[in-house]
Swiss-Prot record:
Family statement drawn from the similarity comment of this UniProt entry: Belongs to the TER reductase family.
GO molecular function: enoyl-[acyl-carrier-protein] reductase (NADH) activity; NAD binding; trans-2-enoyl-CoA reductase (NADH) activity
HAMAP family: FabV_reductase
Pfam families according to UniProt: Eno-Rase_FAD_bd (PF07055), Eno-Rase_NADH_b (PF12242), Enoyl_reductase (PF12241)
Name of the protein in its database record: Enoyl-[acyl-carrier-protein] reductase [NADH]
Catalytic activity annotation: a 2,3-saturated acyl-[ACP] + NAD(+) = a (2E)-enoyl-[ACP] + NADH + H(+); a 2,3-saturated acyl-CoA + NAD(+) = a (2E)-enoyl-CoA + NADH + H(+)
Domain of life, per lineage: Bacteria
Enzyme active site: 236
Length: 402
């Protein structure tokens, strides 16, 4: 079928299979350009592997270090008559090109919060991956979590705490500057956000993997977080989501103590602001990202997801000089270091009050933001003919959990 973008709110309801594949190829090329090393992870599990930082982790592990990878995600497959989600096509493209490079690649499509997903992962590690993994990447960003056992459903809330937050934002449907107000989260919403986006599920994964004996000696685990700056703190770090990320930090300390007994470790990696399906949903982020992209591009500091993950693997987790990774006082790996430079943030603060609907495209990189957003769904690429027919029914080596 012929597929063009249809954007509603912060979601594009259509996806382009070929565009998604080209995006993955672009990330593979960026990784390969930095050279392939053989002194890093060999067997990698990525939980939340189909888009954003999770996908970039999988690409970096496979094409930067020659690792075998197992990816878990929750996506909709395409059929002959309907396109699937972007994450499905990203994962299909990854699988195709990893196999072409002679690398082991297997995927599981299902609820990554479920015990069934953990059981399936453990079975595959035992039967197909040599029995153990040496890196576990935890990269789930979900609005909903169904608790294993009880089946109770918890929902996360993108809300401030204590008082209504009002700030300048972009109406991304109309490309206009508006005042956005968000009501504060209730105590229950804060609690549920911690349950969905905190460290509980990460710990359940490590419990299960360790209990089954499928974690290698020296195995590491990393989970992703975002702290941001005072511009975004009210809605993020000081909001319900921030409380969940504090829980993630506490979980990392516990897991690190456990894994360190066998020569490994666990860290939270704090990453920079990038255009992802997760960040597009957070009010104020599109405007902040549009500003910080412009400033960082001008300073030669800009990074996308794959550049961030390359730096995380090559300069933090698996340093060639054999030294331990540089961490902050909470044992976090900081990849938001360039974004948080004083010169970058001072420029952002000076720019923020000046932005209007009329000068939005001129003062910020909102055009770049829109382009990156469409790219998430396979659109906006110059090397794809969007008026040509494309097959939407793309199958690959993926186990479907019932």
């Amino acid at each position: 079928m012929i597929i063009h973008p249809k954007v509603r709110g912060f979601i594009c309801t259509t996806t382009h299979p070929l565009g998604c594949e080209r995006n993955v190829l672009e990330q593979i090329a960026a990784t390969r350009a930095r050279g392939v090393r053989n002194d890093g992870p060999k067997k990698v599990l990525v939980i939340g592997a189909s888009s954003g930082y999770g996908l970039a982790s999988r690409i970096t592990a496979a094409f930067g270090f020659g690792a075998d990878t197992l990816g878990v995600f929750f996506e909709k497959p395409g059929t002959a008559s309907k396109a699937g989600t972007a994450g499905w096509y990203n994962s299909a493209a990854f699988d195709k090109h990893a196999k072409a490079a002679g690398l082991y690649s297997k995927s599981i499509n299902g609820d990554a919060f479920s015990d069934a997903a953990r059981a399936q992962v453990i079975e595959l590690i035992k039967t197909e991956m040599g029995g153990q993994v040496d890196l576990v990447v935890y990269s789930l960003a979900s609005p909903v979590r169904k608790l294993p056992g009880s089946g109770e459903v918890k929902r996360s809330a993108l809300k401030p705490i204590g008082q209504t937050y009002t700030a300048t934002a972009i109406d991304t449907n109309k490309d206009t500057i508006i005042q956005a107000s968000i009501e504060p989260a209730s105590a229950q919403e804060i609690e549920e956000t911690i349950t969905v986006m905190g460290g509980q599920d990460w710990e359940l994964w490590i419990d299960a993997l360790e209990g089954a004996g499928v974690l290698a000696d020296g195995a590491r685990s990393v989970a992703f977080s975002y702290i941001g700056t005072e511009i975004t703190w009210p809605i993020y770090w000081h909001g319900a989501l921030g409380k969940a990320k504090v829980d993630l930090d506490r979980t990392a300390q516990r897991l690190n103590a456990r894994l360190a007994k066998h020569g490994g470790g666990a860290n939270v990696a704090v990453l920079k602001s990038v255009v992802t399906q997760a960040s597009a949903a957070i009010p104020v982020m599109p405007l902040y990202i549009s500003m910080v992209y412009k400033i960082m591009k001008e300073k030669g500091l800009h990074e996308g997801t794959i550049e961030q993950l390359d730096r995380l693997f090559r300069e933090r987790l698996y340093r060639q000089d054999g030294q331990p990774a540089e961490v902050d006082e909470q044992n976090r790996l900081r990849l938001d270091d360039w974004e948080l430079r004083d010169d970058v943030q001072d420029a952002c603060k000076a720019l923020w009050p000046q932005v209007t609907t009329e000068n939005l495209f001129e003062l910020t990189d909102y055009a770049g933001y829109k382009h990156e957003f469409l790219k998430l769904f396979g659109f906006g690429r110059t090397d794809v003919d969007y008026d040509a027919d494309v097959a939407t029914d793309v199958a690959f080596d993926c186990i479907e959990l019932a």
